[in-house]
């Protein structure tokens, strides 16, 4: 399971021009599910993301987590992160989970995140979305749980 984590001042997900998820200070997570992923892997990735110390402490050092700062979370499904781009001029998506598994584990991740954090917003699984964000830093990390 892959999470592309971006520290944001604001992020928003729209479908057909309608805002379906929006946050202020926090993390935008683009989430990709791979064929061998499990609920346990989703929970491990959530633990890493929510505890990852990428927010500044009073001394300006990256020393605080999303939980520490009471930040918000926007989770967006992004199967293209699992693409195989090693050869050719077109990505292969055979390394992405089936839509059924992807949606089940995406929903599990969101459910667990909602129980752990005070404000969780989502995109819409499988939808064509417009994502806007203001990245702070920019600060972006790719986290993977195998």
Swiss-Prot record:
Keywords: Cytoplasm, Hydrolase, RNA-binding, tRNA-binding. One of its GO terms (molecular function) is Ser(Gly)-tRNA(Ala) hydrolase activity. The keyword Manganese does not apply. It catalyses: glycyl-tRNA(Ala) + H2O = tRNA(Ala) + glycine + H(+); a D-aminoacyl-tRNA + H2O = a tRNA + a D-alpha-amino acid + H(+). It is an enzyme of class 3 (hydrolase). Its EC number is 3.1.1.96. A motif (Gly-cisPro motif, important for rejection of L-amino acids) lies at residues 137-138. GO terms for biological process: D-amino acid catabolic process. It holds the Pfam family Tyr_Deacylase. The keyword Transmembrane helix does not apply. It is found in: Cytoplasm. Gene3D superfamilies: D-tyrosyl-tRNA(Tyr) deacylase (3.50.80.10). GO terms for cellular component: cytoplasm. Its main location: cytoplasm. An aminoacyl-tRNA editing enzyme that deacylates mischarged D-aminoacyl-tRNAs. Also deacylates mischarged glycyl-tRNA(Ala), protecting cells against glycine mischarging by AlaRS. Acts via tRNA-based rather than protein-based catalysis; rejects L-amino acids rather than detecting D-amino acids in the active site. By recycling D-aminoacyl-tRNA to D-amino acids and free tRNA molecules, this enzyme counteracts the toxicity associated with the formation of D-aminoacyl-tRNA entities in vivo and helps enforce protein L-homochirality. Belongs to the DTD family. NCBIfam families: D-aminoacyl-tRNA deacylase. PANTHER family: D-AMINOACYL-TRNA DEACYLASE 1, D-TYROSYL-TRNA TYR DEACYLASE. A Gly-cisPro motif from one monomer fits into the active site of the other monomer to allow specific chiral rejection of L-amino acids. Homodimer. This is D-aminoacyl-tRNA deacylase.
């Amino acid at each position: 399971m892959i999470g592309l984590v971006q520290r944001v001042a604001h992020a928003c997900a729209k479908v057909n021009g309608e805002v379906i998820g929006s946050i202020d200070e926090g993390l935008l997570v683009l989430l990709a599910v791979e064929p061998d992923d499990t609920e346990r892997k989703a929970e491990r990735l959530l633990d890493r993301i929510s505890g990852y110390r990428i927010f500044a402490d009073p001394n300006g050092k990256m020393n605080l987590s999303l939980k520490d700062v009471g930040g918000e979370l926007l989770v967006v499904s992004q199967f293209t992160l699992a693409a195989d781009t090693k050869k050719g001029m077109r990505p292969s998506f055979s390394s992405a989970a089936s839509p059924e598994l992807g949606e089940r584990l995406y929903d599990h991740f969101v459910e667990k995140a909602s129980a752990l954090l005070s404000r969780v917003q989502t995109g819409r699984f499988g939808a064509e979305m417009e994502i806007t964000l203001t990245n702070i830093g920019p600060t972006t990390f790719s986290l993977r749980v195998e």
